[in-house]
């Protein structure tokens, strides 16, 4: 029996909050197929590397984010037979979360608002991968401290609330949010310092605590705004 030849890639859904918008890192393809369309940072897996090593290499070399504080986790695998017209390609997608970062060093890579990255604008099945990555991030904000990965090392509760509002796409009551995040066990650790960078009264600065899961969870509002 002849073993079919299948290529394997890693593709990265890298998200950040820039200019009060949820943004993803993409680049514009110059060659066919899908010339002129936007695509996620990705690359073929080498014979001498495992999946996590390939993802780290693509993050550093293709995405231009070497050394950046990016939370990276495996999202899922995509293997539809016709997802790449050139050959059979299986993609292992990763989700990356980062605080606001400058324009990456890699040529052609740019931050685009998530709402502008429609299926018609993107190559292959990357719009689907991106959408599922965003939904993973939205869901994990409910029960893990992942929201802090969008923030700098030290942040205020108001800055963290804005992350939740932007990622979830909804408004949150400031007092209720403050009560919930400060009441969640080991979610936030006070630094003992404060800042007035929000333009109002000095606000306390926090760091992410050691919690892996939020107890109680931060439930996303349901309704017309979802």
Protein language model features and the residues they cover:
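N-terminal strand-loop-strand
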Residues: 1-38
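Active-site segment of metal-dependent pyrophosphate-handling enzymes
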Residues: 6-10, 23, 52-105, 138-147, ...
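Short, well-ordered beta-strand micro-motif
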Residues: 14-16, 26, 95-97, 205-207
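Active-site-proximal cofactor/substrate-binding loop regions of enzyme domains
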Residues: 30-33, 37-51, 55, 60
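NUDIX/MutT-family hydrolases
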Residues: 93-96, 103-142, 152-158, 162-163, ...
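Short helix-coil junctions and helix-kink-helix linkers
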Residues: 162-171
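Long, intrinsically disordered, low-complexity Ser/Thr/Pro-rich regulatory/activation regions
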Residues: 189-226
